[in-house]
UniProtKB/Swiss-Prot annotation:
GO terms for cellular component: cytoplasm; nucleus. Residues 77 form a propeptide. It is found in: Cytoplasm; Nucleus. Keywords: Cytoplasm, Isopeptide bond, Nucleus, Ubl conjugation. Ubiquitin exists either covalently attached to another protein, or free (unanchored). When covalently bound, it is conjugated to target proteins via an isopeptide bond either as a monomer (monoubiquitin), a polymer linked via different Lys residues of the ubiquitin (polyubiquitin chains) or a linear polymer linked via the initiator Met of the ubiquitin (linear polyubiquitin chains). The keyword Nucleus applies. This is Ubiquitin. PANTHER family: UBIQUITIN.
Amino acid sequence: MQIFVKTLTGKTITLEVEPSDSIENVKAKIQDKEGIPPDQQRLIFAGKQLEDGRTLSDYNIQKESTLHLVLRLRGGY
């Protein structure tokens, strides 16, 4: 199924995923497309931050859902 990931810059990334895919797996796909390390990615859906060990179906994420990607940058505060 396809889902969309919207970044803070307004860019939308399209990913091909399965409902059984873990959040980690989705972050790895984002890394493949965008080069962003998974440890810097925070994915938000329906106002909730998604945890690595859970799956898309755990969060009731269905085809053509849009996730929001927030980057957690290291240091600098």
